[in-house]
Amino acid sequence: MRRLTLVRHAKSDWSLPGQVDWDRPLNKRGQRDAPEMARRLRSRKLKPDRMISSPAVRALTTASVMARELKVAATQLQQDERLYLASPADMLAVVRELGGDAKHLMVFGHNPGITEFANQLSASEHIDNLPTCGVFTALFDIGDWRDLAWASGQEAEFDYPKNHP
């Protein structure tokens, strides 16, 4: 059994004129939400073995904050450029290729791809939108990430910052 947790980056700052999309930092809400969502995961004992993030500043910062809160070693956080504005097919390829022996893999990315990826992986659930810093976790009855297939996951968790005000 494998567990995949998808995390959309926390809320980012759009206020800097001329800011390149790749370089957008987290805003105050994002800086608050990322550690809070990590604490929720920790309270449910959902600590990943490996994390893979888009290298865009907002995604990588979210991943780094969550890694620190979840006490995941920095060596277990990997960046992959294919996750920046990735399609579901791109994300599937990254997970299959880089999941390795992780029993619980956490992937950080962007909309719309990450919401679409969650929906295409789920055998039964559909979410309209994975909000910023939202977390979607599914379980897969596979022994190897290379066997991950569409519509094969059973939703285990769906949470987001405004779910518990």
Show which residues each predicted segment covers:
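Charged phosphate-binding loop/patch that engages nucleotide di/tri-phosphates or the phosphate backbone
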Residues: 154-165
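Short, glycine/serine-rich, charged loops/turns that create anion-binding
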Residues: 11, 56, 112, 142, ...
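Active-site-proximal alpha-helix that buttresses catalytic centers in soluble enzyme cores
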Residues: 2-83, 90, 127-128, 165
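Domain-level recognition of soluble alpha/beta enzyme cores
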Residues: 125-156
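Residue-level preference for the first positions of well-ordered beta-strands
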Residues: 4, 103-106, 135
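A glycine-rich beta-strand to alpha-helix segment
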Residues: 102-118, 122
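Glycine-rich phosphate-binding loop signature in dinucleotide/nucleotide-binding domains
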Residues: 44-46, 98-103
